[in-house]
Amino acid sequence: MSVHYTLNLRVFWPLVTGLCTALVCLYHVLRGSGGARAEPADGVDGGFPLLKVAVLLLLSYVLLRCRHAVRQRFLPGSPRLEGHAAFSSRHFREPGLSILLESYYEHEVRLSPHVLGHSKAHVSRIVGELVRAGRARGSPGLIPGGALALAFRGDFIQVGSAYEQHKIRRPDSFDVLVPLRLPPLVALEPRSLGEEPALAPAFRGCFLCALKAPPSPSGASGGHWLRDCKPFADAFCVDVRGRRHLSATLVLRWFQSHLQRSLATVRYSLEGRCRVTLTPGGLEQPPTLHILPCRTDYGCCRLSMAVRLIPAVHLGDGVFLVAPPPPPLPSAPLLELPEGLRAEALWGVNTARQEQKLLSWLQERAAPGACYLKCLQLLKALRDLGARGLDSAAATQWGRILSSYVLKTVLLAVLLRKGAPGQGWDEEHLGRCLEELVQFLRDCLLRRHTLFHCVLGPGGAAAEVGPLPKALREAAPVDLLAAFDGHARELAAARLLSTWQRLPQLLRAYGGPRYLARCPPPRSQRTQGFLEGEP
């Protein structure tokens, strides 16, 4: 996807100042190296003090120009002062929402493409070496003979906002799918749970994955196949209603131990470039690889990065099975499953490849200068502003209801209703476009609209994303907000609306240049939970 490069004044002007200072120091060193030169006669100036004064004047001029350029960029033109009228802030209009959004985007939201590119390059190199080492190492010792064990496929797939050009703030977290290779004797039969009776809404987007015999031209008996794949079934499967099903819990346990062994293999070769540590995870949080580069081409790119390594089982057509999504509330008791189902046998589905195709399809049909990705970034920033003042439990619930995936789905739903981003999605209508996204999200929270999964929805975008596996084509539509109860959704909608109404005040208080903060900061809203209504 295209990336627009703009001049970053926060980097450019300090760089110019540092360069001028370096030139002065270099001149001083070169002048001092001629020690054998005779001192000038009394009353004769050597010229260096005059040069220092000139350089100081130049630096002062540069700083004044920098300040003037920023003011002219983010403030509307001020009326001319006539006579000897006193200079007062009343001569300036308060900046409008569009100016505040642009200022906040440039100072708090926008990522440097240069730093993001270097961060992604570091992640690709380190994860690539780790995955190749894991593939070469194999899976010794877990299963007798080793031929019926899982293994790394040898590649990895970069997913998430960092690779879809809508990540915000810092390029310090990434998501990577690590595909696993099944033994040749094992095939999978995935099945959606969307039509399962008496199933809680939180599980309707999950899948079961039963084992089955692959097609055999020799016509081997089923009993012979069951006997041959018994070591694999004992190590990675659980019984569900009389059949062996692949277990996400057991696969993740193997994946973490195999990652640890693979990291021990490549750690020595990585010591000269970076420090790498691995944090174990669980079903709610996959293992995380922490990378701190020791040396880079540019000092500005020495960022500590966290890479979530997600084990994935390929279903076909770029669709993967991954660990199921976390429960809607972290403190809520575990939801009961219907008789015969087991939580460790549940899988989620990852359609990142299809979503990337859908974004590319929209970009091809978008009008020149469309800002829909910028609107998505600002919608994420709006969510972060809305979390201010909440306690940790309420902030966690707010973040899960308005997750980045939900916000991306809101954007895709709004755009697909119109066919493509038209002329109304340009920079001049940024505030109106953002308001449209907020209103649609509020309506989804209040059940006026249903926020379906962009691929697993009714009709969906199958024509734009290409073919899908049979299990996904036959799956029931998935409502992304169905897991949350009505009370939590109403409170989130009220919080979202109040955040939007106070957005100019929040933008002045928390972002942009200090001279935009002409109003007092928002009152303290430290609450134990969501707001019950409008503030």
Curated annotation (Swiss-Prot):
Residues in compartment: Cytoplasmic: 65-535
Membrane topology: Single-pass type I membrane protein
InterPro entries the UniProt entry points to: ITPRIP-like, Mab-21_HhH/H2TH-like, MAB21L/cGLR
Subcellular location(s) of the protein: Membrane
Keywords: Membrane, Phosphoprotein, Signal, Transmembrane, Transmembrane helix
Signal peptide: 1-38
Modified residues (Phosphoserine): S139
GO annotations of cellular component type: membrane
Extracellular compartment segments: 39-43
First-listed, main subcellular location of the protein, grouped into a coarse class: membrane
TM spans (from-to): 44-64
Gene3D superfamilies according to UniProt: 1.10.1410.40, 3.30.460.90
Pfam families referenced in this protein's UniProt entry, alphabetically: Mab-21_C
Keyword Membrane found: yes
Record family assignment: Belongs to the ITPRIP family.
PANTHER family: CELL FATE DETERMINING PROTEIN MAB21-RELATED, INOSITOL 1,4,5-TRISPHOSPHATE RECEPTOR-INTERACTING PROTEIN-LIKE 2
Name the record gives this protein: Inositol 1,4,5-trisphosphate receptor-interacting protein-like 2
Organism: Homo sapiens
